[in-house]
Amino acid sequence: MADIKNNPEYSSFFGVMGASSAMVFSAMGAAYGTAKSGTGIAAMSVMRPELIMKSIIPVVMAGIIAIYGLVVAVLIANSLTDGITLYRSFLQLGAGLSVGLSGLAAGFAIGIVGDAGVRGTAQQPRLFVGMILILIFAEVLGLYGLIVALILSTK
């Protein structure tokens, strides 16, 4: 009876949802960041095509957010078993939501800052360093979620 209480049939569902949410939410954030900063690069490159390669940094940083989600999703998926406990699957759900939602927020921040920063850098090149610093702070938001997710998934 105690085994059914700790290991119900539906317990693996929460682990799968953790892996799915890690990938889905972080990919949504990365996609938004890529699209938003990419449109800024496209608009800026009409007037200053020589700055395209220098302005690609926000797109790269947005893509890294999806890698965070992929790492956690793979870790969770590899640790799923038939007899997983409810406690362990809730930890996996928490890990997936942690990296996924922080990746979503970081992607939004990177997209908005990248768009405005690229357009501003085209007009005033001294803004480049400030844009990079703000992008680093936005990227760290996703990194915090990755750290919490790794702690939760390895517990």
From Swiss-Prot:
One GO CC annotation: synaptic vesicle
Keyword Transmembrane helix recorded: yes
Residue numbers on the Lumenal membrane side: 1-10, 77-92, 153-155
Annotated site residues (Essential for proton translocation) in this chain: E139
Membrane topology: Multi-pass membrane protein
Chief place of localization: membrane
Domain of life: Eukaryota
GO BP annotations, alphabetical order: negative regulation of autophagic cell death; positive regulation of ERK1 and ERK2 cascade; positive regulation of Wnt signaling pathway; synaptic vesicle lumen acidification
Classification via InterPro entries: ATPase_proteolipid_c-like_dom (IPR002379), ATPase_proteolipid_csu (IPR000245), ATPase_proteolipid_su_C_euk (IPR011555), F/V-ATP_Csub_sf (IPR035921)
A Pfam family per the record: ATP-synt_C
CDD domains: ATP-synt_Vo_c_ATP6C_rpt1 (cd18175), ATP-synt_Vo_c_ATP6C_rpt2 (cd18176)
Transmembrane residue ranges: 11-33, 56-76, 93-114, 132-152
GO molecular function terms noted in the UniProt entry: proton-transporting ATPase activity, rotational mechanism; ubiquitin protein ligase binding
Keyword DNA-binding tagged: no
UniProt cross-references to PANTHER family, sorted A to Z: V-TYPE PROTON ATPASE PROTEOLIPID SUBUNIT (PTHR10263)
The protein's role, per its UniProt record: Proton-conducting pore forming subunit of the V0 complex of vacuolar(H+)-ATPase (V-ATPase), a multisubunit enzyme composed of a peripheral complex (V1) that hydrolyzes ATP and a membrane integral complex (V0) that translocates protons. V-ATPase is responsible for acidifying and maintaining the pH of intracellular compartments and in some cell types, is targeted to the plasma membrane, where it is responsible for acidifying the extracellular environment.
Name of this chain's protein: V-type proton ATPase 16 kDa proteolipid subunit c
